[in-house]
Amino acid sequence: MIKSRIFKKGSSNGLSLTEVGFGTAPLGNLYKPISDSEANSALEAAWKSGVRYYDTAPLYGLGLSETRLNRFLRTKLRDEYVLSTKVGRLMKPCGESNRTGHGKWFEVPSRQEVYDYSYDGVMRSIEFSYERLGINKIDIAYVHDLCIFTHGSKQASDERIRQFFDNGGYRAMIGLRDQGVIKAIGGGINEWEVCENLAQKGDFDIFLLAGRYTLLEQEALDTFLPLCQKRGIKIVTGGPYNSGILATGAIEGAF
C-alpha cells in the first residue's frame, strides 16, 4: 500500500497526503475522450492501491473532471481522503464553437475559461467547485497558472501575479484558510521561479510544481526548495515523469 505523510504547518489543520496522488486532468478528456466508466475504474484502481490524495481544477474538462470526481468521492467517507482544486479561472457557458480547448478537451461542456484572480473571482470559483464536486469541504486550494507557460511572457505572468495580490485574490484565499473553509493554500504552477516569487510575497502552505522538478530538471534545488524547507512550505510534484523521455529516449514533440 502507498504510504502517507503528515503535513502540518504551524496550526492544528494537519493534512495526511499519500506519497502518490491522483491528478485528474485526464478525467476531463484531455487529448482524448474517455467514458464515465473508464474514469471511475481508474479512480477505483487508485483507491484500491492506497491513493488518498486527489487533485482537480475547474479547467480540467471545463468542469467535467470535478463532476466525475463527484460521482466517485460520494461513495467514500469524507475524512478518508484529501482533495485539492484550483482558483483563477471561471467557466462561463457559451456556444460550442466558442468554448475553450478545441483539440485539447474532448466531449466536454460548452464553457469558456475567463481568468479572474480577484477576490470575487476566487470566492465564486470555490463556490462553483463545491457545486460540481458535490461536497462540503475542500482541503487545499491552489491559485492556478500564474505562470509564463500559460500567459505567454514574464511580463504577462507578472501582471497576473499583481492582479492576484492587488485585486484581492490572495486576501480571499487567506480568509478562506483563516475561517477553516479550506485547510491549506498554495499555487499550482508550471515554473519553480513563479512559485519562488509567490513564496516571497505571501504566506503559502504548499505548492504543486507541475512537471518542473524531475530527474532531468533539478534547478529548483538551488534556491526554491531550500526556501520552502526553511519556511515549512510543502511541495507536490505534478508529472514527476514528465514526458517519459528517460524510458523512451528522445522523441519528436517531447516536452
How should these model regions be labeled?
Residues 1-96, 104:
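N-terminal binding-site loop/beta-alpha segment at the start of enzyme catalytic domains
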Residues 6, 38, 146-255:
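Beta/alpha (TIM)-barrel catalytic core signal, keyed to glycine-rich beta->alpha loops juxtaposed to Asp/Glu
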Residues 22, 39, 46, 54, ...:
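Conserved, mostly hydrophobic/aromatic
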Residues 25-27, 57-59, 86-90, 143-146, ...:
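Active-site beta-loop-alpha junctions enriched in small/polar residues
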Residues 25-37, 107-123, 158, 255:
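Active-site mouth loops of central-metabolism enzymes
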Residues 33-46, 118-132, 190-197:
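Short, acidic/polar
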Residues 94-105, 249-254:
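Short, flexible, mixed-charge acidic loops at enzyme active sites
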Residues 130-155:
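Active-site groove signature of glycoside hydrolases
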